[in-house]
Design a protein with these regions (language model features):
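A short mixed-secondary-structure module that forms the rim of ligand-binding clefts
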Residues: 1-20
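Charged, gly/pro-rich active-site loop segments
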Residues: 19-120
């Protein structure tokens, strides 16, 4: 999916400070390269078997026990492993107040952040 359309968006809200952040950017999929090899090597052995599942995550299964990854072939598990790296190019920051709200936007220009206050 990300190889066809690398756009991503994140939404965060902190109820204590009443701050909402929306961020946009793009993602790069790393598969069987130096990035994935380094991440795989750093991963605890006990976690690697989780990538050996035959059905993809979210696939319907008839029996809940089929959702447990078997210990087994590390090469097969690594074949299912990928690392996603992303960069943010736009941030929309909104602070909600009882009497007023404040909002700012930040756009990455390729070398610096352009920032502007905008109407909430």
């Amino acid at each position: 999916v990300f190889r066809k359309d690398p756009r991503v968006a994140w939404n965060f809200f902190d109820p204590q400070t009443k701050v909402q952040v929306r961020a946009h950017g793009s993602v790069t999929v790393h598969h069987d390269n130096e990035v994935t090899r380094a991440a795989w090597a750093a991963m605890p052995e006990a976690n690697k078997h989780n990538y050996a599942m035959p059905p993809a995550p979210g696939s319907p299964i008839d029996d809940p026990s089929l959702g447990q990854a078997p210990a087994g072939d590390e090469a097969a598990a690594y074949a299912n492993f990928a690392v996603l790296s992303s960069g943010i190019t736009f941030i929309d920051w909104l602070q909600l107040g009882d009497e007023w709200h404040r909002r700012a936007q930040f756009t990455w220009t390729g070398g610096d952040w352009r920032r502007a206050w905008v109407a909430p």
